[in-house]
């Protein structure tokens, strides 16, 4: 039984899987967009989000941890100087997965995984918004009960 065993095996042994993830993380951070299969992209998203969070920390220990995963020192520099500062206000969710369709050879679902570009604006709910929503729901309920009462009286 596979109870409490998270992560996909992707048809590879552990060392091959780790090497593939390191290669894909390096490519994604270098090019900021890659095409791959759906399962690989979902696993890659976890590692890339962790690397960008390390980049946001920005200290020497975080840089050394990133070097363990990212295989190119230039890409590590790009992560810490260019990519991570774009996401200082964003609390996670640095990547986007866009479905493309299935691959011709083996019908595997293909996706594009890319770094999110637009600015993050945190949603702030105001008391006025909550009050307006509550009032609109109350008026809809009142109208529905009136309509039900009118139809009952018409009968």
Curated annotation (Swiss-Prot):
GO terms for biological process: translation. It comes from the Bacteria. GO terms for molecular function: structural constituent of ribosome. Keywords: Ribonucleoprotein, Ribosomal protein. GO terms for cellular component: cytosolic large ribosomal subunit. Belongs to the bacterial ribosomal protein bL17 family. HAMAP family: Ribosomal_bL17 (MF_01368). Part of the 50S ribosomal subunit. Contacts protein L32. This is Large ribosomal subunit protein bL17. It comes from Syntrophotalea carbinolica (strain DSM 2380 / NBRC 103641 / GraBd1) (Pelobacter carbinolicus).
